């Protein structure tokens, strides 16, 4: 095999895309900072038990594992940043009140999430710790939408809402082994009514009927009224439905944005403890942004604080945005002529891009559009349009 061939689903980022990614990274972090979120930078490598705290089997399977040559302990390359941020909140910051934290860095996956996906996403996220109320849920969702808007995505956005408490409440008190539970979850996600009917035949009536009803409970806000009738009698379900209705109302009416509900959406079921959302945009094969409430994530660190947040892959975000135009630049000769270096330094200090053409070469730069040049006229260096 050639030495230049990279592993499957791993790719270099070339100049034009790299510039776009970096500009978006800065825009996203600045948007989060505008909400009061503080930047943290956890390490890429960490002890395995910290990386897999309260995250379920899926993240375990996605994590690259190795042995530390210094200590002999099992370590992992992070597949998700949230457990690390939970550790920072619990033990390093150790604040009593609300902590707003954001991050942006690479994660590594053993397998791609879907066909053609990278195994090295650049994950951006924002999280609130310390507030259990719906206000925190609303803020992170509004921030996620503002991040997309800052990136240039505002039309055709679909916000899909669900709540993990609904399915948990329907399973409460039902003796079912892990294998059957996994099959029920798969049937709900696939909206497979016949499979779900067979699997729940022996369940108590309330759980059986409620789970079977879920496969039909998706669509616009009217779904919540239908769910209130079909799933009545469970306080946890009533609270979840009321929260979803209030959350949707908090977003307000926007003709460029659609709000939908899918009460059988169980992605991240082992991870989320309450409200969860996905944001879909034109051109993306799946949800571009995912988030929700995960109050149990800090339990392993001895400080189980309320937590809610979201994340997205910046590289995937770039893929659904139009290519950005080349940056305008000034072409300058490579020379020891008097005043040239001072003129170039002054232009760069003023924010201009100045590309010096090396002897024997023309302007071969793909990333910049040299629409001006620096020329000498009457003993002075001046910028002239090309």
Swiss-Prot record:
Write the protein's name.
ATP phosphoribosyltransferase regulatory subunit
One GO BP: histidyl-tRNA aminoacylation
Role description? Required for the first step of histidine biosynthesis. May allow the feedback regulation of ATP phosphoribosyltransferase activity by histidine.
Q: Which domain of life is it from?
A: Bacteria
User: Taxonomic classification, please?
Assistant: Bacteria, Pseudomonadati, Pseudomonadota, Betaproteobacteria, Burkholderiales
The listed locations are:
Cytoplasm
Q: What is its pathway?
A: Amino-acid biosynthesis; L-histidine biosynthesis; L-histidine from 5-phospho-alpha-D-ribose 1-diphosphate: step 1/9
Positions of disulphide bridges: none
Organism listed in the record: Variovorax paradoxus (strain S110)
Q: Which family does it belong to?
A: Belongs to the class-II aminoacyl-tRNA synthetase family. HisZ subfamily.
Q: How does it assemble?
A: Heteromultimer composed of HisG and HisZ subunits.
Additional free-text comment from the UniProt record:
This function is generally fulfilled by the C-terminal part of HisG, which is missing in some bacteria such as this one.
Alphabetically ordered keywords of this record: Amino-acid biosynthesis, Cytoplasm, Histidine biosynthesis
GO CC terms: cytoplasm
A single GO molecular function, which one? histidine-tRNA ligase activity
Q: Which residues form the signal peptide?
A: none
Pfam families (UniProt xref): tRNA-synt_His
């Amino acid at each position: 095999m050639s030495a230049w061939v990279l592993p499957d689903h791993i790719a270099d980022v070339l100049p034009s895309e790299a510039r776009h990614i970096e500009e978006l990274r800065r825009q996203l972090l600045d948007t989060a900072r505008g909400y009061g979120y503080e930047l943290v930078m956890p390490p890429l490598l960490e002890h395995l038990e910290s990386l897999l705290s309260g995250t379920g089997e899926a993240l375990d399977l996605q994590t690259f594992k190795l042995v530390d040559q210094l200590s002999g302990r099992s370590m992992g390359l992070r597949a998700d940043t949230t457990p690390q941020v939970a550790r920072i909140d619990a033990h390093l910051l150790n604040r009593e009140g609300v902590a707003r934290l954001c991050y942006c860095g690479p994660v590594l996956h053993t397998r791609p999430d879907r066909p053609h996906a990278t195994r090295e996403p650049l994950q951006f996220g924002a999280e609130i710790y310390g507030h259990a109320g719906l206000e925190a849920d609303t803020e992170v969702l509004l921030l996620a939408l503002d991040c997309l808007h800052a990136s240039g995505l505002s039309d055709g956005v679909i916000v899909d809402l669900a709540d993990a408490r609904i399915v948990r409440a329907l399973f409460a008190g039902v003796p079912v082994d892990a294998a059957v539970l996994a099959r029920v979850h798969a049937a709900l996600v696939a909206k497979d009514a016949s499979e779900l009917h067979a699997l729940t035949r022996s369940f108590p009536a309330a759980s059986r009927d409620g789970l079977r009803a879920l496969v039909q409970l998706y669509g616009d806000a009217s779904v919540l009224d239908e769910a209130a009738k079909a799933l009545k009698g469970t306080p946890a379900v009533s609270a979840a439905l009321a929260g979803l209705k209030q959350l949707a109302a908090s977003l307000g009416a926007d003709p460029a944005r659609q709000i939908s509900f899918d009460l059988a959406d169980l992605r991240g079921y082992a991870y989320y403890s309450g409200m969860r959302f996905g944001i879909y945009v034109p051109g993306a094969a799946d949800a571009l942004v995912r988030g929700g409430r995960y109050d149990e994530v800090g339990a392993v660190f001895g400080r189980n604080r309320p937590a809610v947040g979201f994340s997205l892959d910046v590289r995937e975000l770039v893929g659904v945005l139009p290519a950005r135009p080349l940056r305008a630049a000034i072409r300058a000769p490579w020379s020891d002529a008097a005043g040239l270096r001072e003129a170039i330094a002054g232009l760069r200090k003023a924010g201009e891009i100045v590309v010096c053409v090396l002897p024997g070469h023309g302007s071969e730069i793909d990333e910049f559009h040299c629409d001006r040049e620096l020329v000498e006229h009457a003993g002075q260096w001046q910028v002239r349009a090309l």
